[in-house]
A protein has these predicted regions:
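Non-heme Fe(II) oxygenase catalytic core, chiefly the N-lobe of the double-stranded beta-helix
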Residues: 1-157, 162-198
Length: 198
């Protein structure tokens, strides 16, 4: 695929911190990624632990964000890379959905931040105020002490829980082959009752 192809450029959004499918009303539960062909330079995947990041917040911040609701859309994440023109069909497909900023894991009950580059607005806040809050929280949550860097080898298989991690791929040499196969396990419930995110 040519480097200037729209699909290729659109997929560069995977270099931003994100949680898979947070732009869907019912986001993904797990993801699995398998390495078939590894790029010789770059292409590591970084994972940030949103449980540890939440635990490290001060009590005042935890109280401030406890009940906040964010709007998630692919138009937010791709917009930050300069994608501003969408067809009417894409606008309908990528309509913002609502997600809680703080999630409680349904199995072990531990709280975590639910951040993603797809989050572009916070309900009840002005756009600049909400985006600054999300940026501050993302900078906090992706500090080195919360991040695992996976350096891929052929046949590696990594599985993660999207409900308590964010991840991103690092830049790599686009002139060299790279073959990664991903599977995603669908979630079973929304993080918040959906309303029209207008």
């Amino acid at each position: 695929m040519p480097r200037d192809h729209r699909t290729h450029l659109f997929n560069l959004g995977n270099c931003l911190w994100h949680s898979d499918s947070s732009f869907r009303p019912i986001p993904a539960k797990f993801s699995l990624l398998s390495a078939r062909v590894v790029n010789p330079k770059g292409g590591n995947t970084e994972f940030a632990d949103m449980r540890a990041a939440y635990d490290a917040l001060d009590d005042e911040t935890k109280a401030e964000i406890e009940d906040l609701i964010c709007e998630h859309s692919l138009m937010y994440s791709r917009g930050s890379l300069g994608f501003l023109d969408y067809t009417d069909e894409e606008k309908e497909m990528f309509k913002p959905v609502l997600q809680r900023l703080v999630r409680t894991h349904p199995v072990h009950g531990r709280k975590s931040l639910y951040l993603s580059s797809h989050a572009g607005a916070v309900r009840g806040m002005s756009m600049p105020e909400g985006r600054l809050l999300l940026r501050d929280l993302t900078e906090h949550a992706t500090q080195p002490e919360f991040v695992h860097v996976h350096k891929w080898k052929v046949h590696d298989l990594v599985m993660w829980d999207n409900r308590q991690t964010v991840h991103r791929v690092r830049r790599y040499d686009q002139s060299q082959p790279r073959d990664m196969r991903r599977a995603t396990v669908a979630g079973t419930q929304p993080t918040v009752a959906q309303q029209a995110a207008e």
